[in-house]
From Swiss-Prot:
SMART domains: HTH_XRE (SM00530). Belongs to the class I-like SAM-binding methyltransferase superfamily. C5-methyltransferase family. The lineage of its organism: Bacteria, Bacillati, Bacillota, Bacilli, Bacillales. This is Type II methyltransferase M.Sau96I. The gene is sau96IM. The active site is at 174. One of its GO terms (molecular function) is DNA (cytosine-5-)-methyltransferase activity.
Length: 430
């Protein structure tokens, strides 16, 4: 979307607005933000275009140059107005000061470990699952691991935090809000795990936050769930941006898409010299043969004899369509007759492709992920490699608990690039 600068200058004269500085003040953005809006190198946020049009007392379409970008008149809150398609290479970014992170729903530590790799320091990590909490303690004894209910922590935050926090992070579950959109505040979110996350954000007021979730959040409950979240973040005083990031683009041998929401505190946005941008995709995308070399031995869930005989017939890169028809029918049951979504059944991954999204169980029928050569699921350490955990990162609990922790984790390398994009942004203020 490009703005019609000539039209804007004319409208400024009509409203007796003499300078860009005055215009920026009326829109309640910084002068640099306004300059970015006018630059052909940046995509202006639709919400800022709407605010600009409101100040100039015109329709947004009167100041948009490209006809294909014209906005619907009197449009309601639209989650896509906050989708940011601006990226920057952060491969070589280094911090110029220390930034600390308070993480919620930490799980096995994929997000926290990735942020640490980006140069950020974990002040505290909240995790109620005993095995995941123990995983964090084993690997990072110096982290303040808080094994407690997130709602209790949100209500008694002063008991757990005694210093200023730079970044709040976490991946709360995707849940429907009972009154989504009616009040557009905390009350909409009571009874969900987003509520304590937003309450912690409200109390800490960090410079920035990272909220990570499944891709399905974008259209969950017809988009209402995401829109309520964005409204809450905005009311708390944050500029918000989101996008879908595919882990395969960020040194992870796995096609795993997640929505990442970034919030920047408004006072920083007004002072910024350059805006936040998401990390640019890396040129090389790893495949299984890149990450599954010399993997340490570890436990693995075994197939049943019947399933093993079926999976022996599937070639690398293949699935149920490569099976003899009668065997496929017997194996798939009712799924044979249902339409679509069956390519994950009896799936054997090839060495020359990334893994499909790992789940919390390595041998579920609908989301099979069979080893390329051996007729078995991926082992614990193979699972961890695919999620870009280092070999020295230990997982607590039984085999099932370990698979669950790894399958639920944010891939470490994806988290690293997200962290680097925030470090790049925050570095400008030092």
């Amino acid at each position: 979307m490009r703005l019609n600068k000539g039209s804007i200058i004319e409208k400024m004269k009509n409203q007796n607005i003499k300078t860009q500085t005055e215009l920026a003040e009326k829109i309640d953005i910084s002068k640099s933000q306004l300059s970015f809006m006018f630059s052909d190198e940046y995509e202006p946020l639709k919400k800022n275009v709407i605010k600009l049009a409101d100040v100039l007392k015109v329709s947004p379409n009167d100041i948009i140059l490209d006809e294909e970008d014209q906005m619907p008149i009197n449009s309601d809150f639209n989650r896509y107005d906050y989708k940011l398609d601006e990226f920057i290479d952060v491969s070589n970014v280094r911090k110029n000061k220390d930034y600390n992170v308070f993480e919620t729903f930490a799980g096995a530590g994929g997000l926290a470990l990735g942020l640490e790799s980006a140069g950020l320091s974990t002040y505290g990590a909240v995790e109620i699952d005993k095995n995941a909490a123990e995983t964090l303690r084993i690997n990072r004894p110096k982290w303040k691991v808080i094994e407690n209910d997130i709602e209790f922590i949100a209500d008694n935050l002063d008991e757990f935090i005694d210093e200023e926090i730079d970044i709040l992070s976490g991946g709360y579950p995707c849940q429907t809000f009972s009154y989504a959109g009616k009040r557009n505040g905390f009350a909409d979110t009571r009874g969900t795990l987003f509520y304590p996350y937003s309450k912690i954000l409200s109390k800490l007021k960090p410079k920035a936050f990272i909220a990570e979730n499944v891709r399905g959040l974008v259209n969950h409950d017809d988009g209402k769930t995401l829109e309520v979240m964005l409204k809450v973040f905005i009311k708390e005083g944050y500029e918000v941006y989101w996008n879908i990031l595919n882990s395969w683009n960020y040194d992870v041998a796995q096609k795993r898409e997640r929505i990442v929401i970034i919030g920047i505190r408004e006072d920083l946005v007004k002072e910024q010299k350059y805006p936040f941008r998401f990390p640019l995709a890396q040129v090389y995308k790893p495949v299984l043969k890149d990450v599954l070399k010399d993997v340490p031995k570890s436990k693995v869930t075994a197939y049943s004899d019947k399933k093993r005989e079926v999976m022996k017939l599937v070639p690398p890169g293949g699935c149920w369509v490569d099976l003899p028809e009668q065997i496929a029918k017997d194996y798939m049951g009712k799924s044979w007759y249902s339409g679509g979504g069956k390519r994950g059944m009896a799936r054997r991954i090839s060495w020359d492709e990334p893994c499909l999204t790992l789940t919390t169980s390595p041998s579920q029928k609908q989301t099979e992920r069979c080893h390329p050569d051996e007729t078995r699921p991926f082992s614990i350490r193979e699972y961890a490699r695919i999620q870009s955990f280092p070999d020295e990162w230990e997982f607590s609990g039984g085999v099932g608990a370990q698979y669950r922790q790894i399958g639920n984790a944010v891939p470490v390398n994806l988290a690293k690039y997200i962290g680097k994009s925030l470090v790049h942004y925050l570095n400008q203020f030092n």
